[in-house]
Amino acid sequence: MIMCLKQSWQFSPTGGIQTVNMKPHMTDSEILLFNKVLDESTIYYEFGCGGSTSVALNKKNITKVYSIDTDKNWLNKFDHPKLHKTYIDVGETESFGIPVNESKIDNWKLYSTSIDEILDEPDTVFIDGRFRVACGIKTWFNVNEKTNVLIHDFTGRTHYHELLNLYDIKTTCEQLVLLSKKSSTVDLNEMYDRYKHDIR
């Protein structure tokens, strides 16, 4: 599952590996906040593999990187000694790992529940892939009040804001929000059932 690649990298259009850092799909200001949080992390968990993965792998203070994705071909391009990667088969996908149909809808919840399967407790979780509200709910069960939870595209996507029943906002930068777990009286089973198949 884990293969070695000792250099910083990004991918060329032909699929080759170059020894250059891959930049996350964020603004410069968002990247500054992202880096600040990861500089304080040792065990990092992310929903959605990409430029954020490259940043995490290049942090000497981070000893383990867990990355979940729905695009097998994309995920297989990422290899590093401290990378633990998991592919969730949600069926055929288009850009950004979005399933094109519901042929494997029964597998969709495996994406958000993947965080239940690790033995480590992450100190940073980044939610930037599919099923983001469902991922936020499942993350809540697997972190403590000191864990940093980052969600991208949060500010402009109001359906993500229901997660504020579970988390407090520590800070925001444009579309990136940093959250911390809080006590909640919400019916989490009902909430999860509503969002477990929501690909947004």
What are these regions (language model features)?
Residues 1-21, 191-200:
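Non-catalytic N-terminal targeting/anchoring module and adjacent flexible stem/linker
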Residues 9-40:
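Class I SAM-dependent methyltransferase Rossmann-like catalytic core
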Residues 21-28, 47, 102-105, 130:
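Conserved phosphate-coordination/catalytic loops
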Residues 28-95:
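SAM cofactor-binding core of SAM-dependent methyltransferases
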Residues 41, 121-123:
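Local beta-strand N-terminus motif with an aromatic residue
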Residues 74-81, 94-98, 157-164, 179-182:
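Short, charged, surface-exposed secondary-structure boundary motifs
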Residues 79-118:
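S-adenosyl-L-methionine
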Residues 124, 130-200:
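C-terminal substrate-binding/active-site "lid" region of AdoMet-derived donor-dependent transferases
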